[in-house]
Amino acid sequence: MKTEIDILSDREVEIWDYAESQNGTMDFVTEKLAEEGIFDQYRNIHKSYLELYFRIDDEGAKLEILKRLIFLNWYAQVEPSCYTGIEDLDNATVSESYSILNQYLIDGKIDAEFKWMLSFYSSWDYTILPFSENKLEALTAFVKGVDTSILSCPKNQLPKGVMDNRGQMGIYWISMSVEKKIM
């Protein structure tokens, strides 16, 4: 039986597949996706992750949900929406997820995987600092403390399949070759 997080992941992949299948200029595809409500659907997925975070008690699942929220916050700003189906995420959801992340940093609750992911996203500090500066001290310090001259994601080091079934976050990290290649 699929969990709620699996269902949200499947919905993410469906939207990504649909966006990827579109033809035309970036402007044309963006307009088409907007008219078809694709961006609204993704905004709802993003909000649903946050709602699920607050409904469950499993700390491992909460951490996974937070990883996906932070990825989507970042990805919505760095990748054109015509390729992802993600546009104009709800600012309250983005802010709340960064606030949760700030507390995780204070409490030392992020794992090694989340640390390298967040270090990678911090190379685009403009995606995080507007939400954290003068509000979320631990997150701001983390972002500003990252050495952006060093590639923070593991290349061909993670076990094959570790990024499977993790929504667009998993698709992205597979495309960045973080998993070992099978010879």
Region spans (language model):
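Start-of-helix signal in alpha-solenoid helical-repeat scaffolds, especially tetratricopeptide repeats
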Residues: 63, 112, 116-119
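Structural signature of tandem alpha-helical TPR/SEL1-like repeats
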Residues: 132-134
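Structural register within alpha-helical repeat arrays
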Residues: 69, 118, 123-125, 142
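A short, structured loop/turn motif at beta-sheet edges
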Residues: 106-112
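Residue at a conserved register position within TPR or TPR-like alpha-solenoid repeats
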Residues: 73, 80, 122-125, 129
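N-terminal alpha-helical interaction modules that lie
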Residues: 1-106, 143-183
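A structural signal for the main folded, soluble domain(s) of proteins
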Residues: 112, 138-141
